[in-house]
Amino acid sequence: MTSFQPQSSYSRDDLIECGKGNLFGPGNAQLPLPNMLMLDRITHISHTGGEFGKGEIIAELDISPDLWFFECHFPGDPVMPGCLGLDAMWQLVGFFLGWKGNLGRGRALGCGELKFTGQILPTAKKITYHIHLKRVIERKLIMGIADGRVSCDGKDIYFAHDLRVGLFQNTDSF
């Protein structure tokens, strides 16, 4: 493990360092690099708090019409793919596991229920992700289970229940 010192917030530069494997150490939890990094900042992360008192994360992504996905999804009808918002929530659960000092490479393991009740258009200004940890297993298996919400300019539009992310020492047979 590196000499990682947990903070309560992280800048985009910090998140990119995480994507390079420099935050939690080589071979441990890391975020994807742009373009798949769906966060600009983590404004709050805590071991306590959230709806279940087991931890929470609040993060943001600034929206601009020149983001890569608007050009291809869909021509003449640009909208952010919902799967990117879902992936951002998985990214945050994995980040939380590494932030807590757990070792291993992160992998999304699924989610229970997922609902989309709105969309993210190029005219939007900001997405906010709010993750509520329900359970963190820290034994031979390292896994986080959380509920998440995505809001666009203050309106809740995506809801995910039982997001699951695990950390694995070896992903060869995954």
From Swiss-Prot:
Keyword hit for Lipid biosynthesis: yes
Protein name (record): 3-hydroxydecanoyl-[acyl-carrier-protein] dehydratase
Catalysed transformations (reactions): a (3R)-hydroxyacyl-[ACP] = a (2E)-enoyl-[ACP] + H2O; (3R)-hydroxydecanoyl-[ACP] = (2E)-decenoyl-[ACP] + H2O; (2E)-decenoyl-[ACP] = (3Z)-decenoyl-[ACP]
InterPro entries: FabA (IPR010083), FabA_FabZ (IPR013114), HotDog_dom_sf (IPR029069)
Listed HAMAP family: FabA (MF_00405)
Cited Pfam families: FabA
GO molecular function: (3R)-hydroxyacyl-[acyl-carrier-protein] dehydratase activity; trans-2-decenoyl-acyl-carrier-protein isomerase activity
Physiological role: Necessary for the introduction of cis unsaturation into fatty acids. Catalyzes the dehydration of (3R)-3-hydroxydecanoyl-ACP to E-(2)-decenoyl-ACP and then its isomerization to Z-(3)-decenoyl-ACP. Can catalyze the dehydratase reaction for beta-hydroxyacyl-ACPs with saturated chain lengths up to 16:0, being most active on intermediate chain length.
Recorded GO CC terms: cytoplasm
Organism: Cellvibrio japonicus (strain Ueda107)
Active site, renumbered: 73
Cellular localisation: Cytoplasm
Pathway: Lipid metabolism; fatty acid biosynthesis
Gene Ontology BP term (one): unsaturated fatty acid biosynthetic process
Keywords: Cytoplasm, Fatty acid biosynthesis, Fatty acid metabolism, Isomerase, Lipid biosynthesis, Lipid metabolism, Lyase
Family statement drawn from the similarity comment of this UniProt entry: Belongs to the thioester dehydratase family. FabA subfamily.
Protein EC: 4.2.1.59, 5.3.3.14
NCBIfam families associated with the record: fabA, PRK05174.1
Subunit record text: Homodimer.
